[in-house]
């Protein structure tokens, strides 16, 4: 078994799927850890090609020999809610002004997608977490 590599950094970014490039925010974040930026961009774009149009969070683990591994997460709940509601952005004053409505079925569908990243034991709990996010964005859940 190979000796374990020493981790020197953990970088968390949210990048459009299939559109990572060396420009900010990707370049500076990776550059300060000495990672080969183009190598990451090519690997990320290849891994997220099928999900174009979504923002995909990524966790990059950097090792002392400047190599890296990355793990893709599910799109942020807020982005999925905006897409389901068909609006560009949430409300500026969420508890006064409501901008859209989503059904419980849509919330459950988003919860199914996000299940692996949420701290919930079953779909009902996950749906409540997503509904809370919707409420704080000024989206009504019916």
UniProtKB/Swiss-Prot annotation:
<dbReference type="InterPro" id="IPR006519">
    <property type="entry name" value="Ribosomal_uL11_bac-typ"/>
</dbReference>
<comment type="subunit">
    <text>Part of the ribosomal stalk of the 50S ribosomal subunit. Interacts with L10 and the large rRNA to form the base of the stalk. L10 forms an elongated spine to which L12 dimers bind in a sequential fashion forming a multimeric L10(L12)X complex.</text>
</comment>
<dbReference type="InterPro" id="IPR020785">
    <property type="entry name" value="Ribosomal_uL11_CS"/>
</dbReference>
<dbReference type="Pfam" id="PF03946">
    <property type="entry name" value="Ribosomal_L11_N"/>
</dbReference>
<keyword id="KW-0687">Ribonucleoprotein</keyword>
<dbReference type="InterPro" id="IPR000911">
    <property type="entry name" value="Ribosomal_uL11"/>
</dbReference>
<keyword id="KW-0694">RNA-binding</keyword>
<keyword id="KW-0699">rRNA-binding</keyword>
<dbReference type="GO" id="GO:0003735">
    <property type="term" value="F:structural constituent of ribosome"/>
</dbReference>
<dbReference type="InterPro" id="IPR020783">
    <property type="entry name" value="Ribosomal_uL11_C"/>
</dbReference>
<dbReference type="InterPro" id="IPR020784">
    <property type="entry name" value="Ribosomal_uL11_N"/>
</dbReference>
<dbReference type="GO" id="GO:0022625">
    <property type="term" value="C:cytosolic large ribosomal subunit"/>
</dbReference>
<dbReference type="GO" id="GO:0070180">
    <property type="term" value="F:large ribosomal subunit rRNA binding"/>
</dbReference>
<dbReference type="InterPro" id="IPR036796">
    <property type="entry name" value="Ribosomal_uL11_N_sf"/>
</dbReference>
<dbReference type="GO" id="GO:0006412">
    <property type="term" value="P:translation"/>
</dbReference>
<dbReference type="InterPro" id="IPR036769">
    <property type="entry name" value="Ribosomal_uL11_C_sf"/>
</dbReference>
<protein>
    <recommendedName>
        <fullName>Large ribosomal subunit protein uL11</fullName>
    </recommendedName>
</protein>
<keyword id="KW-0689">Ribosomal protein</keyword>
<comment type="function">
    <text>Forms part of the ribosomal stalk which helps the ribosome interact with GTP-bound translation factors.</text>
</comment>
<dbReference type="Pfam" id="PF00298">
    <property type="entry name" value="Ribosomal_L11"/>
</dbReference>
<keyword id="KW-0488">Methylation</keyword>
<comment type="similarity">
    <text>Belongs to the universal ribosomal protein uL11 family.</text>
</comment>
